[in-house]
Amino acid sequence: MLVKADMTKDIAQVMAEVGRKAKAAAAPLSIATSEQKNKALNAAADAILEARADILEANRLDLANAEKNGMAASFVDRLTLNEARIDAIAEGIRAIATLPDPVGEVIAEWDRPNGLHIERVRTPLGVIGVIYESRPNVTADAGALCLKAGNAVILRGGSDSAHSSAAIHKALEAANLPADAIQIVPVTDRAAVGEMLKGLGGAIDVIVPRGGKSLVARVQSEARVPVFAHLEGICHLYIDKSADLDMARRIALDAKMRRTGICGAAETLLVDRAVASTHLAPILGDLAAGGCEIRGSAEVLALYPAAKPATEEDWSTEYLDAIISVALVDGISGAIDHINRYSSHHTEAIVAEDAQTVARFFNEIDSAILLHNASTQFADGGEFGMGAEIGIATGKMHARGPVGVEQLTSFKYRVRGSGQVRG
Protein backbone atom coordinates (compact mmCIF):
# COMPACT_ATOMS: atom_id res chain seq x y z
CA MET A 1 0.00 0.00 0.00
CA LEU A 2 1.11 3.57 -0.58
CA VAL A 3 2.94 4.99 2.41
CA LYS A 4 1.75 8.40 3.55
CA ALA A 5 5.13 9.81 4.41
CA ASP A 6 5.52 12.35 7.17
CA MET A 7 8.06 14.64 5.55
CA THR A 8 9.11 16.01 8.93
CA LYS A 9 11.00 12.74 9.26
CA ASP A 10 14.26 12.33 7.40
CA ILE A 11 14.49 9.93 4.49
CA ALA A 12 16.21 7.24 6.54
CA GLN A 13 13.30 7.20 8.98
CA VAL A 14 10.72 7.14 6.20
CA MET A 15 12.45 4.25 4.46
CA ALA A 16 12.94 2.35 7.71
CA GLU A 17 9.18 2.55 8.21
CA VAL A 18 8.62 1.21 4.69
CA GLY A 19 10.99 -1.67 5.47
CA ARG A 20 9.29 -2.52 8.76
CA LYS A 21 5.88 -2.64 7.09
CA ALA A 22 7.18 -4.82 4.26
CA LYS A 23 8.81 -7.23 6.70
CA ALA A 24 5.59 -7.48 8.68
CA ALA A 25 3.59 -8.10 5.50
CA ALA A 26 5.95 -10.81 4.28
CA ALA A 27 5.13 -13.23 7.09
CA PRO A 28 1.41 -13.73 6.36
CA LEU A 29 2.08 -13.58 2.61
CA SER A 30 4.49 -16.51 2.90
CA ILE A 31 1.68 -18.79 4.09
CA ALA A 32 -1.15 -17.35 1.98
CA THR A 33 -3.03 -19.99 0.01
CA SER A 34 -2.95 -20.17 -3.77
CA GLU A 35 -6.65 -19.29 -3.82
CA GLN A 36 -6.08 -16.17 -1.72
CA LYS A 37 -3.21 -14.97 -3.90
CA ASN A 38 -4.99 -15.66 -7.17
CA LYS A 39 -8.14 -13.89 -5.99
CA ALA A 40 -6.06 -10.84 -5.09
CA LEU A 41 -4.28 -10.89 -8.46
CA ASN A 42 -7.51 -11.10 -10.46
CA ALA A 43 -8.93 -8.24 -8.40
CA ALA A 44 -5.79 -6.24 -9.19
CA ALA A 45 -6.24 -6.86 -12.92
CA ASP A 46 -9.85 -5.68 -12.70
CA ALA A 47 -8.75 -2.58 -10.80
CA ILE A 48 -6.15 -1.70 -13.45
CA LEU A 49 -8.80 -1.81 -16.18
CA GLU A 50 -11.28 0.19 -14.11
CA ALA A 51 -8.64 2.87 -13.52
CA ARG A 52 -7.68 3.01 -17.21
CA ALA A 53 -8.69 6.65 -17.70
CA ASP A 54 -6.80 7.83 -14.61
CA ILE A 55 -3.69 5.85 -15.58
CA LEU A 56 -3.68 7.26 -19.12
CA GLU A 57 -4.14 10.79 -17.81
CA ALA A 58 -1.21 10.33 -15.41
CA ASN A 59 0.87 8.91 -18.24
CA ARG A 60 0.14 11.97 -20.37
CA LEU A 61 1.73 14.11 -17.64
CA ASP A 62 4.86 11.95 -17.67
CA LEU A 63 5.01 12.04 -21.48
CA ALA A 64 4.65 15.83 -21.49
CA ASN A 65 7.57 16.11 -19.07
CA ALA A 66 9.63 13.72 -21.20
CA GLU A 67 8.96 15.82 -24.30
CA LYS A 68 9.82 18.99 -22.41
CA ASN A 69 13.10 17.43 -21.29
CA GLY A 70 13.98 16.27 -24.80
CA MET A 71 14.10 12.57 -23.97
CA ALA A 72 15.02 10.09 -26.73
CA ALA A 73 12.32 8.35 -28.73
CA SER A 74 13.29 4.96 -27.28
CA PHE A 75 12.88 6.34 -23.75
CA VAL A 76 9.47 7.78 -24.63
CA ASP A 77 8.41 4.42 -26.08
CA ARG A 78 9.26 2.62 -22.82
CA LEU A 79 7.38 5.29 -20.88
CA THR A 80 4.27 5.31 -23.06
CA LEU A 81 1.04 3.66 -21.99
CA ASN A 82 -1.98 3.29 -24.25
CA GLU A 83 -5.18 1.25 -24.33
CA ALA A 84 -3.43 -1.83 -25.69
CA ARG A 85 -0.57 -1.67 -23.18
CA ILE A 86 -2.96 -1.29 -20.25
CA ASP A 87 -4.89 -4.30 -21.52
CA ALA A 88 -1.56 -6.15 -21.71
CA ILE A 89 -0.72 -5.21 -18.11
CA ALA A 90 -4.05 -6.60 -16.90
CA GLU A 91 -3.68 -9.72 -19.05
CA GLY A 92 -0.18 -10.22 -17.64
CA ILE A 93 -1.50 -10.10 -14.08
CA ARG A 94 -4.22 -12.62 -14.92
CA ALA A 95 -1.62 -14.85 -16.57
CA ILE A 96 0.44 -14.75 -13.38
CA ALA A 97 -2.66 -15.79 -11.42
CA THR A 98 -3.03 -18.89 -13.63
CA LEU A 99 0.56 -20.02 -13.07
CA PRO A 100 1.26 -22.89 -10.68
CA ASP A 101 1.99 -21.65 -7.17
CA PRO A 102 5.74 -22.14 -6.63
CA VAL A 103 5.52 -21.90 -2.84
CA GLY A 104 5.56 -25.32 -1.24
CA GLU A 105 6.59 -27.12 -4.43
CA VAL A 106 8.78 -30.12 -3.73
CA ILE A 107 11.76 -29.58 -6.05
CA ALA A 108 13.48 -32.84 -5.15
CA GLU A 109 13.13 -35.63 -2.60
CA TRP A 110 15.10 -38.71 -1.66
CA ASP A 111 15.54 -41.33 1.03
CA ARG A 112 18.70 -41.99 3.01
CA PRO A 113 19.91 -45.46 4.06
CA ASN A 114 19.16 -44.55 7.68
CA GLY A 115 15.48 -44.03 6.83
CA LEU A 116 15.42 -40.24 6.71
CA HIS A 117 13.21 -38.80 3.98
CA ILE A 118 14.51 -35.45 2.68
CA GLU A 119 12.60 -32.90 0.61
CA ARG A 120 13.82 -29.66 -0.96
CA VAL A 121 10.86 -27.26 -0.95
CA ARG A 122 10.35 -23.82 -2.53
CA THR A 123 9.84 -20.91 -0.13
CA PRO A 124 9.37 -17.15 -0.63
CA LEU A 125 12.44 -14.94 -0.52
CA GLY A 126 10.75 -12.46 1.83
CA VAL A 127 10.97 -8.80 0.82
CA ILE A 128 12.02 -7.78 -2.69
CA GLY A 129 13.26 -4.28 -3.50
CA VAL A 130 12.72 -3.29 -7.13
CA ILE A 131 14.44 -0.18 -8.49
CA TYR A 132 13.43 0.80 -12.01
CA GLU A 133 13.40 3.78 -14.33
CA SER A 134 11.03 4.64 -17.14
CA ARG A 135 8.79 1.57 -17.39
CA PRO A 136 5.54 2.18 -15.46
CA ASN A 137 4.31 -1.35 -16.28
CA VAL A 138 6.98 -2.68 -13.90
CA THR A 139 4.86 -1.37 -11.02
CA ALA A 140 2.15 -3.90 -11.85
CA ASP A 141 4.37 -6.70 -13.17
CA ALA A 142 6.74 -6.69 -10.21
CA GLY A 143 3.94 -6.34 -7.68
CA ALA A 144 2.01 -9.25 -9.17
CA LEU A 145 5.02 -11.57 -9.51
CA CYS A 146 6.19 -10.93 -5.96
CA LEU A 147 2.69 -11.46 -4.58
CA LYS A 148 2.31 -14.76 -6.45
CA ALA A 149 5.63 -15.95 -5.00
CA GLY A 150 4.54 -14.99 -1.48
CA ASN A 151 6.85 -11.98 -1.18
CA ALA A 152 6.29 -8.39 -0.12
CA VAL A 153 7.75 -5.81 -2.50
CA ILE A 154 9.07 -2.26 -2.22
CA LEU A 155 8.95 -0.40 -5.55
CA ARG A 156 11.11 2.58 -6.36
CA GLY A 157 10.30 3.90 -9.83
CA GLY A 158 12.08 6.71 -11.62
CA SER A 159 10.87 10.29 -11.38
CA ASP A 160 10.19 10.24 -15.14
CA SER A 161 7.39 7.72 -14.65
CA ALA A 162 6.23 8.93 -11.23
CA HIS A 163 2.68 9.93 -12.21
CA SER A 164 2.05 6.73 -14.16
CA SER A 165 3.49 4.45 -11.47
CA ALA A 166 1.51 6.20 -8.74
CA ALA A 167 -1.72 5.82 -10.72
CA ILE A 168 -1.10 2.10 -11.25
CA HIS A 169 -0.25 1.67 -7.58
CA LYS A 170 -3.42 3.51 -6.58
CA ALA A 171 -5.40 1.05 -8.69
CA LEU A 172 -3.67 -1.86 -6.96
CA GLU A 173 -4.60 -0.35 -3.59
CA ALA A 174 -8.24 -0.29 -4.68
CA ALA A 175 -8.08 -4.06 -5.16
CA ASN A 176 -7.72 -4.56 -1.39
CA LEU A 177 -4.48 -6.48 -1.64
CA PRO A 178 -2.88 -7.65 1.62
CA ALA A 179 -1.83 -4.62 3.66
CA ASP A 180 1.65 -3.33 2.75
CA ALA A 181 2.24 -6.22 0.33
CA ILE A 182 3.07 -3.78 -2.46
CA GLN A 183 4.54 -0.46 -1.33
CA ILE A 184 5.81 2.35 -3.50
CA VAL A 185 8.61 4.53 -2.14
CA PRO A 186 6.93 7.80 -1.12
CA VAL A 187 9.88 10.13 -1.77
CA THR A 188 11.64 11.04 -5.01
CA ASP A 189 14.99 11.91 -3.43
CA ARG A 190 17.74 9.57 -4.66
CA ALA A 191 18.83 9.10 -1.07
CA ALA A 192 15.89 6.69 -0.79
CA VAL A 193 17.67 4.38 -3.24
CA GLY A 194 20.75 4.49 -1.04
CA GLU A 195 18.69 3.41 1.95
CA MET A 196 17.22 0.51 -0.02
CA LEU A 197 20.68 -0.61 -1.09
CA LYS A 198 21.69 -0.78 2.58
CA GLY A 199 18.85 -3.25 3.10
CA LEU A 200 16.60 -1.15 5.35
CA GLY A 201 17.95 -2.69 8.52
CA GLY A 202 17.73 -6.25 7.27
CA ALA A 203 14.22 -5.89 5.86
CA ILE A 204 15.14 -6.35 2.18
CA ASP A 205 16.26 -9.81 1.09
CA VAL A 206 17.15 -9.06 -2.54
CA ILE A 207 17.33 -6.04 -4.86
CA VAL A 208 16.26 -6.18 -8.52
CA PRO A 209 17.42 -3.18 -10.59
CA ARG A 210 15.76 -2.58 -13.94
CA GLY A 211 17.13 0.32 -15.90
CA GLY A 212 20.16 1.78 -17.60
CA LYS A 213 23.81 0.92 -17.19
CA SER A 214 24.45 3.66 -14.62
CA LEU A 215 21.59 2.51 -12.38
CA VAL A 216 22.68 -1.12 -12.45
CA ALA A 217 26.31 -0.14 -11.84
CA ARG A 218 25.32 1.90 -8.79
CA VAL A 219 23.22 -0.91 -7.39
CA GLN A 220 25.99 -3.47 -7.87
CA SER A 221 28.56 -1.14 -6.33
CA GLU A 222 26.59 -0.02 -3.28
CA ALA A 223 24.21 -2.88 -2.44
CA ARG A 224 24.70 -4.69 0.84
CA VAL A 225 22.11 -7.30 -0.08
CA PRO A 226 22.03 -9.80 -2.97
CA VAL A 227 21.26 -8.36 -6.42
CA PHE A 228 19.58 -9.89 -9.45
CA ALA A 229 21.46 -7.76 -11.97
CA HIS A 230 19.75 -6.83 -15.23
CA LEU A 231 22.58 -5.46 -17.36
CA GLU A 232 22.23 -3.76 -20.72
CA GLY A 233 21.04 -5.84 -23.64
CA ILE A 234 23.85 -5.90 -26.19
CA CYS A 235 22.09 -8.63 -28.14
CA HIS A 236 23.54 -10.28 -31.25
CA LEU A 237 21.94 -11.92 -34.27
CA TYR A 238 24.17 -14.24 -36.31
CA ILE A 239 23.25 -15.29 -39.86
CA ASP A 240 25.06 -18.52 -40.72
CA LYS A 241 25.91 -19.74 -44.22
CA SER A 242 23.32 -22.50 -43.73
CA ALA A 243 20.53 -20.00 -42.99
CA ASP A 244 17.39 -19.73 -45.08
CA LEU A 245 17.59 -16.21 -46.52
CA ASP A 246 13.87 -15.44 -46.33
CA MET A 247 13.80 -16.54 -42.70
CA ALA A 248 16.93 -14.51 -41.94
CA ARG A 249 15.35 -11.39 -43.44
CA ARG A 250 12.16 -11.75 -41.39
CA ILE A 251 14.01 -12.43 -38.16
CA ALA A 252 16.55 -9.63 -38.61
CA LEU A 253 13.85 -7.04 -39.27
CA ASP A 254 11.79 -8.12 -36.28
CA ALA A 255 14.77 -8.52 -33.92
CA LYS A 256 15.86 -4.94 -34.55
CA MET A 257 12.75 -2.98 -35.49
CA ARG A 258 9.69 -4.47 -33.78
CA ARG A 259 10.50 -2.39 -30.71
CA THR A 260 13.90 -0.76 -30.71
CA GLY A 261 13.78 0.46 -27.12
CA ILE A 262 13.58 -2.86 -25.30
CA CYS A 263 16.48 -4.84 -23.89
CA GLY A 264 15.82 -7.77 -26.22
CA ALA A 265 16.28 -5.72 -29.40
CA ALA A 266 19.23 -6.86 -31.54
CA GLU A 267 22.05 -4.31 -31.50
CA THR A 268 24.66 -6.16 -33.60
CA LEU A 269 24.16 -8.22 -36.75
CA LEU A 270 26.85 -10.75 -37.67
CA VAL A 271 26.82 -12.34 -41.12
CA ASP A 272 28.84 -15.34 -42.22
CA ARG A 273 31.45 -14.09 -44.67
CA ALA A 274 30.69 -17.09 -46.91
CA VAL A 275 27.22 -15.73 -47.80
CA ALA A 276 27.86 -12.00 -47.51
CA SER A 277 27.59 -11.49 -51.27
CA THR A 278 24.07 -12.95 -51.37
CA HIS A 279 22.61 -12.32 -47.90
CA LEU A 280 23.97 -8.99 -46.68
CA ALA A 281 22.33 -6.54 -49.09
CA PRO A 282 18.78 -7.95 -48.85
CA ILE A 283 18.87 -8.03 -45.05
CA LEU A 284 20.32 -4.53 -44.72
CA GLY A 285 17.96 -3.23 -47.39
CA ASP A 286 14.99 -4.40 -45.34
CA LEU A 287 16.38 -2.74 -42.21
CA ALA A 288 17.11 0.52 -44.01
CA ALA A 289 13.64 0.55 -45.57
CA GLY A 290 12.25 0.17 -42.05
CA GLY A 291 14.12 3.29 -40.92
CA CYS A 292 17.17 1.67 -39.36
CA GLU A 293 20.61 3.30 -39.50
CA ILE A 294 23.29 0.81 -40.53
CA ARG A 295 26.80 1.08 -39.05
CA GLY A 296 29.17 -1.36 -40.69
CA SER A 297 32.73 -2.61 -40.66
CA ALA A 298 34.97 -1.80 -43.62
CA GLU A 299 33.98 -5.06 -45.32
CA VAL A 300 30.30 -4.25 -44.87
CA LEU A 301 30.79 -0.75 -46.31
CA ALA A 302 32.39 -2.27 -49.41
CA LEU A 303 29.34 -4.44 -50.02
CA TYR A 304 26.73 -1.97 -48.78
CA PRO A 305 27.98 1.61 -49.35
CA ALA A 306 24.86 3.18 -47.80
CA ALA A 307 26.08 2.13 -44.34
CA LYS A 308 27.97 4.44 -42.01
CA PRO A 309 31.38 3.41 -40.65
CA ALA A 310 31.22 1.55 -37.34
CA THR A 311 33.65 2.44 -34.56
CA GLU A 312 35.08 0.14 -31.90
CA GLU A 313 32.57 1.65 -29.47
CA ASP A 314 29.64 0.50 -31.61
CA TRP A 315 30.31 -3.18 -30.90
CA SER A 316 29.66 -2.66 -27.19
CA THR A 317 26.80 -0.16 -27.42
CA GLU A 318 23.17 -0.76 -26.48
CA TYR A 319 21.49 1.68 -28.85
CA LEU A 320 17.85 1.22 -27.78
CA ASP A 321 17.15 2.98 -31.05
CA ALA A 322 16.81 2.31 -34.78
CA ILE A 323 20.55 1.72 -35.20
CA ILE A 324 22.40 -1.55 -35.76
CA SER A 325 26.10 -2.38 -36.05
CA VAL A 326 27.01 -4.97 -38.69
CA ALA A 327 30.12 -7.12 -39.20
CA LEU A 328 31.19 -10.10 -41.28
CA VAL A 329 32.65 -13.11 -39.45
CA ASP A 330 34.37 -16.36 -40.38
CA GLY A 331 31.49 -18.72 -39.75
CA ILE A 332 30.33 -19.92 -36.37
CA SER A 333 33.83 -19.69 -34.85
CA GLY A 334 34.06 -16.02 -35.75
CA ALA A 335 30.55 -15.37 -34.45
CA ILE A 336 31.31 -17.05 -31.13
CA ASP A 337 34.53 -15.07 -30.72
CA HIS A 338 32.82 -11.74 -31.46
CA ILE A 339 29.84 -12.42 -29.20
CA ASN A 340 31.89 -13.65 -26.26
CA ARG A 341 34.09 -10.55 -26.56
CA TYR A 342 31.38 -7.88 -26.77
CA SER A 343 28.18 -9.39 -25.38
CA SER A 344 26.51 -8.30 -22.15
CA HIS A 345 25.41 -11.96 -21.79
CA HIS A 346 21.74 -11.09 -22.19
CA THR A 347 20.37 -12.63 -25.42
CA GLU A 348 21.87 -13.95 -28.66
CA ALA A 349 20.21 -15.59 -31.68
CA ILE A 350 21.37 -17.68 -34.62
CA VAL A 351 19.65 -18.30 -37.95
CA ALA A 352 20.97 -21.60 -39.31
CA GLU A 353 19.88 -24.99 -40.62
CA ASP A 354 23.07 -26.90 -39.80
CA ALA A 355 22.58 -28.82 -36.54
CA GLN A 356 26.27 -28.93 -35.60
CA THR A 357 26.57 -25.17 -36.04
CA VAL A 358 23.55 -24.60 -33.80
CA ALA A 359 24.97 -26.99 -31.20
CA ARG A 360 28.22 -25.02 -31.08
CA PHE A 361 26.30 -21.76 -30.72
CA PHE A 362 24.32 -23.14 -27.78
CA ASN A 363 27.30 -24.78 -26.10
CA GLU A 364 30.01 -22.16 -26.53
CA ILE A 365 28.18 -18.88 -25.90
CA ASP A 366 27.62 -17.99 -22.26
CA SER A 367 24.54 -15.75 -22.34
CA ALA A 368 21.33 -16.01 -20.35
CA ILE A 369 19.12 -16.61 -23.40
CA LEU A 370 20.08 -18.27 -26.68
CA LEU A 371 17.63 -18.59 -29.59
CA HIS A 372 17.70 -20.62 -32.80
CA ASN A 373 15.70 -19.45 -35.81
CA ALA A 374 13.72 -16.97 -33.72
CA SER A 375 13.84 -13.24 -33.01
CA THR A 376 15.76 -11.90 -30.01
CA GLN A 377 12.56 -10.06 -29.08
CA PHE A 378 11.22 -13.31 -27.63
CA ALA A 379 13.57 -12.66 -24.68
CA ASP A 380 10.66 -11.86 -22.41
CA GLY A 381 9.06 -13.51 -19.42
CA GLY A 382 5.61 -13.25 -20.93
CA GLU A 383 6.77 -14.97 -24.10
CA PHE A 384 8.37 -17.68 -21.96
CA GLY A 385 4.98 -18.41 -20.37
CA MET A 386 5.92 -16.74 -17.08
CA GLY A 387 3.06 -14.23 -17.26
CA ALA A 388 5.50 -11.34 -16.88
CA GLU A 389 8.99 -10.67 -15.58
CA ILE A 390 10.75 -8.25 -13.27
CA GLY A 391 13.76 -8.24 -15.55
CA ILE A 392 16.30 -10.38 -17.37
CA ALA A 393 19.03 -11.42 -14.94
CA THR A 394 22.41 -11.61 -16.67
CA GLY A 395 24.39 -12.83 -13.68
CA LYS A 396 24.98 -16.48 -12.83
CA MET A 397 23.88 -16.72 -9.20
CA HIS A 398 20.39 -17.95 -8.31
CA ALA A 399 18.39 -16.23 -11.06
CA ARG A 400 19.37 -16.07 -14.73
CA GLY A 401 17.26 -15.03 -17.70
CA PRO A 402 13.67 -13.84 -17.17
CA VAL A 403 12.98 -13.32 -13.47
CA GLY A 404 9.53 -14.78 -12.86
CA VAL A 405 7.76 -16.35 -9.91
CA GLU A 406 10.09 -19.34 -9.56
CA GLN A 407 13.16 -17.09 -9.54
CA LEU A 408 11.58 -15.09 -6.71
CA THR A 409 11.74 -18.07 -4.38
CA SER A 410 14.40 -19.82 -2.32
CA PHE A 411 14.14 -23.26 -0.76
CA LYS A 412 14.42 -25.11 2.51
CA TYR A 413 14.86 -28.75 3.44
CA ARG A 414 12.20 -30.80 5.22
CA VAL A 415 13.62 -33.92 6.81
CA ARG A 416 11.26 -36.58 8.18
CA GLY A 417 12.50 -39.27 10.51
CA SER A 418 11.18 -41.98 12.81
CA GLY A 419 13.40 -41.49 15.83
CA GLN A 420 16.85 -41.58 14.19
CA VAL A 421 19.86 -40.34 16.19
CA ARG A 422 23.46 -40.08 15.00
CA GLY A 423 24.90 -41.61 18.15
Curated annotation (Swiss-Prot):
GO annotation terms (biological process): L-proline biosynthetic process
Taxonomy, superkingdom: Bacteria
Example of a GO cellular component annotation carried by this entry: cytoplasm
Main subcellular location of this protein, as a coarse class: cytoplasm
Keyword NADP attached: yes
UniProt keyword annotations, A-Z: Amino-acid biosynthesis, Cytoplasm, NADP, Oxidoreductase, Proline biosynthesis
MF terms in GO: glutamate-5-semialdehyde dehydrogenase activity; NADP binding
SUPFAM superfamilies: ALDH-like (SSF53720)
E.C. no: 1.2.1.41
Protein family (similarity comment): Belongs to the gamma-glutamyl phosphate reductase family.
Enzyme class: oxidoreductase
InterPro entries, alphabetized: Ald_DH/histidinol_DH, Ald_DH_C, Ald_DH_N, Aldehyde_DH_dom, G-glutamylP_reductase_CS, Glu-5-SA_DH, GPR_dom
Annotated gene: proA
UniProt function note: Catalyzes the NADPH-dependent reduction of L-glutamate 5-phosphate into L-glutamate 5-semialdehyde and phosphate. The product spontaneously undergoes cyclization to form 1-pyrroline-5-carboxylate.
Pathway assignment: Amino-acid biosynthesis; L-proline biosynthesis; L-glutamate 5-semialdehyde from L-glutamate: step 2/2
NCBIfam families attached to this UniProt entry: PRK00197.1, proA
Name the UniProt record assigns to this protein: Gamma-glutamyl phosphate reductase
HAMAP family reported for this sequence: ProA
